[in-house]
């Protein structure tokens, strides 16, 4: 089976074709992504209206390119999937409308994909991972620990009570006057800094429920900046390093609590999967590798290009659902909010 996947929930326009082999393995035939970094750089963050207009400008050409690079015609597809949320509603509507139009014109099944579910299932595309497993989703918009028990069967163990991890990185970068996107810039400066110089708080450490919080940590960084008044390059590097170290400690502590809760409520975990753009952060990756080694658990880190938003993950989630007979009506509405654990209408524990 082949499915076209379309992703437009934030500031990447993406289209991909993925094939599901009879034995259950997936193959990415094409994966086209157009970033909007240049469009948003002057504003220091994503502007929803600009993002939606940029999606409109490129989506048709990107879909044609994905089909061409996959050597696939519209008639060869078995289904067309699009991220229907959560995300910036204007952008979501662009991708969803495009997919619906293609499905209607080609008389192919349409699959509305939860963007978070696509992240959750990517490890099954890259590593043929069996259920159940623990998912740490860390991105600009979401920070969650989730028990992935099957397609459409998710138990949220913990989540952020304020900012997402990626959002906090971007806000710290903006405070420090670093270029957009801020996350990679903070990591780059942190590599040159002294993480022990500033003793920033580690929010939520020791709490019995594996939730996250970043607002207090952000405030601590801001207050330290105000105390220093004029920041030297060394100050900036040390602030970034100390902030990143605090985030890493929080993630590991929360993951430890999440794993314990997973084992109590679900049972043994086949692996820990890390997804979302923040999964590309080297310090976080190294800390999670140590944590999983100590916990006797396999760590699955999809390639960086599949951690950030992309069409292949949407196509794969579409394939997983289509193979179970789960298709959607063309009246399916775009959703700005769509909690992953509410998407439980289809429960499946086998390997598609």
Curated annotation (Swiss-Prot):
GO cellular component terms given for this protein: cytoplasm
Gene3D superfamilies: 3.30.420.40
Chief location of this protein within or outside the cell: cytoplasm
Catalytic activity: L-threonylcarbamoyladenylate + adenosine(37) in tRNA = N(6)-L-threonylcarbamoyladenosine(37) in tRNA + AMP + H(+)
Binding site for substrate: 137-141, 170, 183, 281
Location(s), subcellular: Cytoplasm
Keywords: Acyltransferase, Cytoplasm, Iron, Metal-binding, Transferase, tRNA processing
Residues annotated as binding Fe cation: 115, 119, 309
SUPFAM superfamilies assigned: Actin-like ATPase domain (SSF53067)
Primary enzyme class: transferase
Gene Ontology MF term list: iron ion binding; N(6)-L-threonylcarbamoyladenine synthase activity
The keyword Plastid is assigned to this record: no
Enzyme Commission identifier(s): 2.3.1.234
Named cofactor requirement(s): Fe(2+)
Cofactor binding remark: Binds 1 Fe(2+) ion per subunit.
Stretch forming the signal peptide: none
Organism superkingdom: Bacteria
Task of the protein: Required for the formation of a threonylcarbamoyl group on adenosine at position 37 (t(6)A37) in tRNAs that read codons beginning with adenine. Is involved in the transfer of the threonylcarbamoyl moiety of threonylcarbamoyl-AMP (TC-AMP) to the N6 group of A37, together with TsaE and TsaB. TsaD likely plays a direct catalytic role in this reaction.
Family of this protein: Belongs to the KAE1 / TsaD family.
Protein name: tRNA N6-adenosine threonylcarbamoyltransferase
Source organism of the structure: Methylocapsa acidiphila
Lineage: Bacteria, Pseudomonadati, Pseudomonadota, Alphaproteobacteria, Hyphomicrobiales
């Amino acid at each position: 089976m082949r499915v076209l996947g379309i992703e437009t929930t934030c500031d990447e326009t993406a289209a991909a074709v993925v094939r599901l082999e009879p034995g259950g393995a997936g193959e990415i035939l094409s994966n086209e992504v157009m970033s909007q970094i240049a469009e948003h750089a002057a504003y220091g963050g994503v502007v929803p209206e600009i993002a939606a207009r940029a999606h409109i400008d490129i989506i048709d050409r990107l879909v044609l390119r994905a089909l061409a690079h996959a050597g696939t015609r519209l008639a060869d597809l078995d289904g067309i999937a699009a991220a229907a949320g959560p995300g910036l509603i204007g952008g979501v509507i662009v991708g969803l409308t495009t997919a619906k139009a293609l499905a209607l014109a080609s008389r192919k099944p349409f699959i509305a994909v939860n963007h978070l579910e696509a992240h959750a299932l990517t490890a099954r595309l890259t590593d043929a991972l069996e259920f159940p497993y623990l998912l740490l989703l860390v991105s600009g918009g979401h920070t969650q620990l989730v028990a992935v028990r099957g397609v459409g069967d998710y138990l949220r163990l913990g989540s952020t009570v304020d900012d997402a991890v990626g959002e906090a990185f971007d806000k710290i970068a903006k405070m420090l006057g670093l270029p957009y996107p801020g996350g990679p810039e903070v990591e780059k400066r942190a590599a040159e800094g002294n993480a022990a110089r500033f003793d920033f708080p580690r929010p939520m450490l020791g709490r019995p429920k594996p939730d996250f919080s970043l607002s207090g940590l952000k405030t601590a960084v801001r207050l330290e900046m105000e105390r220093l008044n004029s920041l030297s390059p060394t100050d900036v590097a040390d602030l970034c390093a100390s902030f990143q170290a605090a985030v890493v400690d929080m993630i590991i502590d929360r993951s430890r609590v999440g794993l314990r809760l997973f084992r109590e409520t679900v049972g043994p975990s086949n692996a820990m999967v890390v997804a979302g753009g923040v999964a590309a952060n080297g310090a976080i990756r190294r800390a999670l590798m140590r944590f999983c080694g100590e916990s006797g658990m396999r760590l699955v880190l999809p390639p960086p290009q599949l951690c950030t938003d992309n069409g292949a993950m949407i196509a794969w989630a579409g394939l997983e659902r289509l193979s179970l007979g789960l298709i959607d009506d063309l009246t399916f509405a775009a959703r700005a909010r769509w909690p992953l654990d509410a998407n439980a209408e289809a429960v499946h524990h086998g390997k598609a």
